[in-house]
Amino acid sequence: MNYLALGDSYTIGESVPLHDSFPYQVVQLLRKKGYEFSPPEIIAKTGWTTDELLSHLSAIKLLPSYQFVSLLIGVNNQYRKKPLDEYRQQFETLLKKSIRLAANQSSKVIVVSIPDWGVTPYAAGRDVKKISEEIDDFNLLNKSIALLHQANYIDITPGSREALTNKNLLANDGLHPSALEYARWANLLAQKIEAQLKG
């Protein structure tokens, strides 16, 4: 089976080894359960906004369809102060594209919420309350769009905020999640995927 992961630095697993990224951990968990999965195909780059992911997707050739697709994008829209309306439109376009790539089965698409980098050391000296509020605004949009199109939704944001008091959830760069935090995400995704496979 094939799994496509779309996103940004959080999907790549910035600052952790590739096999500790959440898409690779998802596949490892499912393989341990006896499901045959190819290595995940990751289309993501550090710093990407929704428009940059869209632009890249229109320029590359992918498989006709995938058994599962995940989508986690938006932190760089927030960081670069891009308008919410722009995010709404582009995220919905990305989700529709994700559903098409999942053989038009929205139940095979998993939207992951944006983690809150406002709790990380990287945010020191910034208005962390404002960052958290803006992340919540972006997540309200991606959740409502996911539900509208009947895709799965996983809210990892509350867990990401535990990094405020648990630095084991952060990578050495003081910004991105650690392998431990990605493992928590991977468990949630693997549960959703296994539920689909069991039908």
Please identify what each model-predicted range represents:
Residues 55-199:
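Alpha-helical cap/lid subdomain in secreted, periplasmic
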Residues 14-15, 51, 80:
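Short N-terminal helix/helix-N-cap motif within the alpha/beta-hydrolase-1
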Residues 15, 41-47, 85, 126, ...:
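Acidic/histidine-rich helix-loop elements
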Residues 10, 47-49, 116, 160:
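Residue-level detector of flexible, active-site-proximal loop/helix-junction positions
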Residues 1-46, 56-64:
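Serine-esterase "nucleophile elbow" of acetyl-processing enzymes
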